[in-house]
Amino acid sequence: MRSLLSIILILVASAALIAAVPAGSSITPPPPIEPVQLLSSQPSDSKRPWIRLRDWIIESIWGIPKSRSPGFPSKDAAGRAPPSQVLARYGSDVVLRFQLRDQQEAEALAQATDILFLDVWASTSEFVDIRLAQEVIPSLLGLLPDSLRTAYTPLIDNLSEMIYTSYPTRRPVGLENQPGFSSSIRQSQQFGDLFFRDYQPLSVIVHWMRLMSSMFSSHVRLINVGVSYEGREIPALRLGTSGPNTQDTPRKTVLMVGGSHAREWISTSTVTYVAYQLIAKYGKSRAVTRLLEEFDWVFVPTLNPDGYVYTWESDRLWRKNRQPTSLRFCPGIDLDRAWSFEWDGERTRTNPCSENYAGDEPFEGLESAQLAQWALNETQHHNAEIVAFLDLHSYSQQILYPFSFSCSTMPPTLESLEEVAMGLAKTIRQTTQEVYDVTSACEGIVTAQEQKASKRFFPVGGSSGGSALDWFYHQLHTIYSYQIKLRDRGSYGFLLPSEHIVPTGKEMYNVALRLGQFLVGESAQDIDWSADLMDAPGTSDDGRETDVDLNRDGAGEEGVDSELDAVDEEWELIDWEDEHTYELRK
């Protein structure tokens, strides 16, 4: 009873601390947005005392109102545009999927989208998804060859309705069928499940991050990796059991980033989900405990806080940051095209109205520059080594490896990149049955595996130079750098329903666990890593585990280190200095 009372007092104190955000804080919460209705809609007379106390604690932490009436809110009540404004912005918009057969078709489609300033949602080796108003379809088809005028299918024909319903509703998501306080493990899981039942606005995410660092201070710290153009901090959670590294050996760090593109809400939710699973399982799971002892894990839920807030307040499909450009009516820079390495790639983007506008010079996108400076500071002044970089995006279910700027330049560690990526994709397939394709990140590459030949397609949707993926791989020599495009394959696109938050989070948690297992090596062979996979199958009839093992040829910790040393020699084979003048060097 005494321990239970102590836990309650700690939670109450945490609520008070979290609510007391300094007035001068650089984190600027957005106007009040309809929060997730968690608990208060339950009749008070049906609650047990402990449930009411728990509800009050969570409501105090997250600022959840005490009562709501069913139905959609008005603009004044919820800070969200009513349906009339949604219809005014997106009323006739649809999403079309084009199937490409050859390079000429790809070039024609790319040129047409440039001329009409269309929003390319996805461009893969199999399809290209384009958002446009219905009245623009004849103009687009008029610019295309005859073979493409019938090579498309409607993917989303009710875009405005899907956009409106993508925001959290006023439907309560309480604990109707859940008992009162049970074991601490189960209670922790229930607490996490509440947060991930819907997408959350930035203000709630920041409060949640503060809560995590307060409740789990032994292995969680809230840090900032920079400040956005509008003055918001870019918060991150650093997980690990070590303090400042004073040893000669660099502290190995895994970095996971989401929300570079504001409309990709699932990437932000997934970063927080993976972080929460590692936080909650530390000390309970041998595998997770080992990962937090061996590495620092840094999670940045949204690199683009200004754009993310804007998607909640004004434009659900906003992609770029909110930085002014040379055209007053076309603000925003694509933060995944603003990095210095091979900036703007093979095609120059000079139109600020483009969704892929990379700025007028490298690192003009402020948030990208801030993250780059933080990473350089960590490696140069804090004795850290970023050994893995996971850049989460949506959609199309792909695991992409460098380089993105060109399909003709091969990364010096191509074999390792492909092998690990295939193992991660296999882990996803064997646990959640979802298929993630593995390929190079350079846009528009199509591989004919049956003919053992490949052909380059003209990139549809803009240049792929200046990416974070290439910068971390080249500049910091982060060998295991991946851009992962999450669910789905186009049925919902960027408007993925909240029911997919937890399943997608489980997939990336499994990816993080398997990647961590690979990085640790055979020194942790006594740990049953498979036991911690989420939604994992059991064992085969003969008792063998059915999931993938990423330990290649028994490579242990020393094997990984020796591989890193060997890679340093491979980097020297490429003369980057003469050809890539934008690079800042150690």
From Swiss-Prot:
What GO biological process terms does the UniProt entry carry, in alphabetical order? cell wall organization; proteolysis
Record lineage: Eukaryota, Fungi, Dikarya, Ascomycota, Pezizomycotina
Localized where?
A: Vacuole; Secreted
Q: What keywords are assigned to this protein?
A: Cell wall biogenesis/degradation, Disulfide bond, Glycoprotein, Metal-binding, Secreted, Signal, Vacuole, Zinc
Organism of origin is Aspergillus terreus (strain NIH 2624 / FGSC A1156)
Give the protein's function.
Inactive carboxypeptidase that may play a role in cell wall organization and biogenesis.
Which residues bind substrate per the record?
H261, A262, R263, E264, R319, D336, R337, S394, Y395
PROSITE patterns noted in UniProt: CARBOXYPEPT_ZN_1, PEPTIDASE_M14
Report what the protein is called.
Inactive metallocarboxypeptidase ecm14
Molecular function terms from GO: zinc ion binding
Gene it is expressed from: ecm14
The glycosylation sites are: N158, N377
